[in-house]
């Protein structure tokens, strides 16, 4: 690798680290014709930076030159940083060479917008086409959609990328206009809708046509920056819920704002800590909506617009709804068992299965992986005491926080947990 390429790589890999939407699950692209890589069988090897962010792929910008001046972005037009740009062939060569050395399993490619949205999207499209068609590369490719690019370019990119994503940037339109007046949620939603509609069309065609081309097989995602503006957690989660339902997104990512701008007084001061604990609570809430059957207004609402940072959102909901407990594990349905703090998806399924063979006892719960010290305040089993003193929510909260104090300290470093 030449010194110039090494310098470009250092600049453009560092500039890409603020984009967290690089999860790679969900693709079933198989190796064909003795090509390179296999997103289906080999999987993606994830690694984490010191602040807990996933950097599993060759994660780079095509260029950090940008015509926009978004206040929260390190690559903004007015920022005095070293600029660089790859050529199409340089990105292709880097990807293939790194893959052959077993450094990576795929490519995450984004870019600043240089000249125009179409010009930038064309260059990125050339990269993925060369990898697929000329290099016969079958590894994982995550391609960022450039906002405002023509529908034809976006549709063609979907034929070669495993996953595509486009960032909402801010949870509220007010926040976006404050820090990025040249952008709008409407434009992002238009591009998300293009891919959604194409996926629906191809799904319908598969009913009558045997061979339909793969199109963004791992779906599309988006990302929001949290903590830059005065948005509430209700703003963030309602926006996420809206996009899950309207655009069939696979994931919504939350990125705690890392202060990098000394010139904008409306942004958090440089040197202040990014809101990692808040970011973690948002991910836990996202998990509840996607896997636990919670509606967004059960987690946050007008009365409770922000998440409790001291306890996870599932426990917070349980403490606010004592009328729902205790749950009789020998009679309750699966969805209600899922709502018990300390019981996850796997444990809930095991409990339902175990009931076919006998009553649920406390010892069995521990064997099934239930966090009993947390769950015990919210359940009844066959061998639970017949008469139990009714405990207040504040008492239960304090007991759980006291029991788990050392655990919560550990969660802050380096990778925050999603565990409930």
Sequence positions of predicted segments:
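Flexible, acidic/Gly-rich N-terminal and inter-domain linker regions that tether
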Residues: 1-65, 371, 379, 387-411, ...
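Conserved, mostly hydrophobic/aromatic
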Residues: 57, 70, 109, 166, ...
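Short, charged beta->alpha transition segments
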Residues: 58-60, 89-100, 207-208
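Canonical Radical SAM [4Fe-4S] cluster-binding loop centered on the CxxxCxxC motif
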Residues: 60-89
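Conserved AdoMet/S-adenosylmethionine-binding subsite of the radical SAM
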Residues: 92, 115-299
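Short Fe-S-cluster ligation motifs
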Residues: 96-112, 285
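C-terminal extensions
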Residues: 306-336, 362-420
């Amino acid at each position: 690798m030449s010194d110039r390429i090494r310098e470009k790589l250092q600049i453009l890999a560092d500039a890409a680290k603020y984009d967290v939407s690089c999860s790679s699950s969900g693709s079933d692209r198989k190796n064909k014709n003795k090509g390179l890589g296999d997103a289906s069988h080999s999987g993606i090897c994830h690694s984490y930076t010191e602040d807990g962010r996933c950097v599993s792929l060759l994660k780079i910008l095509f260029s950090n030159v940008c015509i926009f001046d978004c206040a929260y972005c390190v690559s903004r037009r007015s920022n005095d940083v070293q600029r660089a740009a790859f050529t199409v062939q340089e990105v292709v060569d880097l990807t293939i060479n790194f893959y052959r050395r077993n450094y990576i399993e795929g490519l995450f490619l984004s870019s600043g917008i240089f000249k125009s949205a179409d010009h930038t999207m064309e260059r990125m499209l050339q990269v993925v086409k060369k990898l697929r068609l000329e290099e016969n590369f079958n590894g994982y490719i995550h391609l960022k959609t450039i906002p405002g690019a023509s529908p034809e370019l976006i549709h063609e990119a979907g034929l070669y990328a495993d996953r595509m994503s486009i960032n909402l940037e801010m949870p509220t339109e007010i926040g976006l206009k404050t820090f990025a007046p040249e952008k709008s949620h409407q434009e992002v939603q238009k591009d998300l809708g293009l891919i959604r509609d194409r996926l629906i069309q191809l799904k319908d065609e598969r009913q009558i046509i045997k061979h339909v081309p793969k199109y963004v097989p791992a779906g599309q995602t988006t990302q929001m920056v949290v903590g830059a503006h005065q948005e509430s957690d209700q703003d963030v989660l309602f926006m996420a819920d809206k996009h899950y339902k309207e655009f069939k997104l696979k994931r919504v990512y939350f990125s705690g704002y890392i202060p990098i701008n000394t010139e904008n007084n409306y942004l958090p001061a440089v040197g202040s800590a990014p809101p990692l604990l808040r970011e973690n609570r948002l991910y836990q809430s996202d998990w509840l909506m996607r896997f636990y059957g919670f509606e967004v207004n059960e987690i946050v609402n007008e009365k409770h617009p922000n998440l409790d940072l001291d306890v996870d959102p599932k426990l917070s909901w349980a403490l606010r709804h004592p009328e729902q407990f205790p749950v009789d594990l020998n009679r309750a349905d699966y969805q209600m068992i899922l709502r018990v703090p300390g019981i996850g998806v796997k444990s809930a399924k095991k409990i339902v299965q175990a009931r076919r063979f006998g009553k649920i006892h406390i010892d069995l719960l521990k064997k099934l992986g239930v966090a009993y010290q947390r769950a015990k305040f919210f359940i009844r089993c066959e061998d639970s005491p017949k008469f139990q003193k009714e405990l207040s929510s504040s008492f239960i909260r304090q007991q759980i926080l006291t029991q788990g104090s050392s655990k919560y300290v550990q969660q802050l470093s380096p990778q925050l947990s999603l565990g409930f």
